[in-house]
Amino acid sequence: MGVVHHANYLRWFEMGRVAYLKEADVYLNPLMEEGIVFPITDVSCKYRSSGRFDDEIVIETVAEAITPVKMIFNYTVRRLADGAVLATGRTQNVFTNKEGKIIRLPAKYYDKLAQLAAIDAADR
């Protein structure tokens, strides 16, 4: 069939989210070493056009909200060749400890994410 499986879009959202964190100088390993995880509590995806196996894609990730207890991101997945929107989506993560209790993200991480989100908001 040659069409990308629908679950791959959620993986691409994750890739976009991780890239966003890195852009803010927030890396997964130090968070996990401190016992901070951020499970998905809500996800949505609207499929706009079929992606094909050989398509090169671009994932646009924009912070809708960054608070000390949660992150909400919006995504647009585009085909590089023609700019066609393949999917749009949204995720919400909450910050928890390893036992699943909601926690506040330490300021050393939150401040970096909030600063990048503010820059993004100003650019829109």
Residue ranges, per PLM feature:
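Terminal targeting signals and extreme-terminal segments of soluble enzymes
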Residues: M1-V58, I66-R124
